[in-house]
């Protein structure tokens, strides 16, 4: 019986961890890549400037970019898995994150808030990609659906971590870019483009900025949720979900298999426990 109750507690813990971030982030609507189920169920990629389009919709009080992805690095000789969450600094500094110690983000770069399960100390600095990030705040209970601890960065830092590549890969990509320009008619007519081609990707207007996972929408008090959602739903490049729908997709998708397994174990344990108790009663009587 105690094992059965323990399995029930594990199941409730899975549900709590799965929807924790969705509850805490405080969004009314989630705008994600068209025909996808959101940043937690699958990969979602939308342009960061989509937030400006969302802000222009009547009834919208605010819109902020959101990035979510998982990385694995080595720290002190051990594997360190981190669920990286990018916050739209300065609008979102992580003030809603429950802190045990430290503070929220105050700078646009090189600061992070970490869950205590990551075993990072306040003030500790870790290298992710080509930069070093300082732990300025510690929180507890903020974990992803797989149980990995969350770490909160600004969106720009989260994207820098996600799209970091070795220097040699950058050099080869720029060389290939220059070769393509040299072999094109445009490169022969405008040789100055060769210098632009081997520069940073951010300096090339034709190349888009890094994509974010979602845009979180906050509605004005008294705004008609259905009307706002209907307006956003007419845009062919995105899909809109409510907070409740995001929770349901997490529970029906990522948590559903674990729920079924735990349910099967509970049924088996109850059945076996019933037989044992019945045999004990039969023996005593």
Predicted features, each with a name:
Residues 2-10, 272-277, 281:
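Hydrophobic alpha-helical membrane-associated segments
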Residues 9, 22-24, 87-97, 105-106, ...:
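Structured catalytic cores of enzymes that bind and process phosphorylated ligands/cofactors
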Residues 29, 168-188, 199-235:
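A short beta-strand structural signal in non-transmembrane regions
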Residues 35-40, 140-142, 216-224:
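Structural beta->alpha junctions
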Residues 66-69, 78-88, 95-197:
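Hydrophobic secondary-structure segments that place a key small or acidic residue at a functional site
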């Amino acid at each position: 019986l105690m094992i059965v109750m323990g399995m029930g507690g594990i199941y409730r813990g899975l549900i709590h961890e799965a929807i924790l971030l969705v509850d805490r982030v405080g969004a009314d609507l989630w705008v994600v890549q068209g025909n996808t189920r959101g940043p937690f169920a699958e990969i979602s990629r939308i342009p960061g400037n989509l937030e400006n389009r969302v802000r222009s919709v009547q009834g919208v009080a605010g819109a902020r970019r959101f990035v979510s992805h998982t990385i694995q690095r080595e720290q002190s000789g051990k594997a360190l898995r981190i669920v990286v969450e990018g916050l739209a600094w300065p609008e979102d500094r992580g003030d809603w994150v429950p802190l045990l110690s430290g503070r929220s983000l105050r700078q646009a770069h090189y600061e992070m808030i970490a869950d205590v399960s990551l075993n990072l100390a306040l003030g500790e600095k870790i290298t992710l990609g080509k930069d070093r990030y300082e732990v300025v705040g510690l929180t507890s209970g903020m974990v992803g659906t797989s149980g990995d601890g969350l770490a909160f960065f600004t969106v720009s830092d989260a994207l820098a971590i996600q799209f970091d590549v070795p220097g040699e890969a950058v050099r080869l990509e720029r060389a290939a870019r220059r070769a393509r320009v040299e072999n094109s008619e445009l490169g022969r007519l405008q040789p100055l483009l060769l210098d632009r081609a081997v520069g940073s990707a951010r300096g090339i207007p034709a190349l888009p900025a890094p994509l974010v996972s979602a845009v979180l929408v906050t509605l004005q008090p008294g705004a008609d949720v259905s009307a706002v959602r209907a307006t956003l739903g007419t845009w062919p490049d995105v899909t809109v979900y409510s907070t409740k729908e995001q929770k349901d997709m997490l529970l029906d998708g990522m948590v559903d298999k674990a729920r079924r397994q735990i349910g099967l174990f509970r049924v088996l344990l109850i059945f076996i426990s019933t037989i044992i108790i019945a045999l004990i009663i039969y023996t005593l009587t």
